[in-house]
Swiss-Prot record:
InterPro entries: DHFR, DHFR-like_dom_sf, DHFR_CS, DHFR_dom. Belongs to the dihydrofolate reductase family. One of its GO terms (biological process) is folic acid metabolic process. Key enzyme in folate metabolism. Catalyzes an essential reaction for de novo glycine and purine synthesis, and for DNA precursor synthesis. Substrate binds at residues 5-7, 27, 57, 120. Keywords: NADP, One-carbon metabolism, Oxidoreductase. Residues 1-160 form the DHFR domain. NADP(+) binds at residues 6-7, 14-19, 43-46, 62-65, 101-106. Its EC number is 1.5.1.3. It comes from Mycoplasma genitalium (strain ATCC 33530 / DSM 19775 / NCTC 10195 / G37). One of its GO terms (molecular function) is dihydrofolate reductase activity. This is Dihydrofolate reductase. Pathway: Cofactor biosynthesis; tetrahydrofolate biosynthesis; 5,6,7,8-tetrahydrofolate from 7,8-dihydrofolate: step 1/1.
Length: 160
């Protein structure tokens, strides 16, 4: 199963200078709890923005450079230069989950393939340079979990 997970403001802001514009401990804890011991797909810049310790996950790191030398952060990392075979393998096996974790171009290319979306909506306004516009017409809002500084919206793909 393919699951995209990200945080954004109500205006669609997802980043600033390759980092999160906010530091909300509860939201980071939600991301950690959701993705721990899971397989993640992310781009090189997203990987480089992770904390020094980011362990107990399998990371498929998308890079044009197949020989990319990544900094070890405590997770198993596999460098790939084409994510479509990976996407297809997880679509064919609904018993295993692959979490799409960014950045912007990875989300834009994969969201329509996802079975579920987990979107943290940050309540406060922030400044930044990366915005994500998502067409949610193919998804149904399944659940909203409210926190003080953000809400987590859980979407599932509409049945065809």
């Amino acid at each position: 199963m393919l699951i995209a997970i990200w945080a954004m403001t109500q205006e669609g802001l997802i980043g600033n200078n390759n980092t999160l514009p906010w530091m909300i401990k509860q939201e980071l804890a939600h991301f950690k709890k959701t993705t721990l011991f899971q397989a993640l797909l992310m781009g090189r810049k997203t990987y480089e923005s992770l904390p020094k310790v980011f362990e107990k996950r399998t990371i498929f790191l998308l890079s044009k450079d197949q020989n990319y030398r990544f900094e070890e952060k405590g997770s198993e990392v596999k460098v790939i230069n084409d994510f479509w075979p990976l996407i297809k393998s997880y679509q064919a096996n609904k018993e295993k989950d692959l979490f799409i974790c960014g950045g912007k171009s990875v989300y834009e290319q994969t969201i329509n393939e996802c079975d579920q979306l987990i979107v943290s909506i940050i309540k406060k306004k922030y400044k930044g340079d990366q915005f994500l516009k998502v067409d949610l017409s193919k998804f149904v809002l399944n659940e909203v979990v409210e926190f003080e500084e953000f809400n987590v919206n859980y979407y599932r793909k509409k049945q065809q």
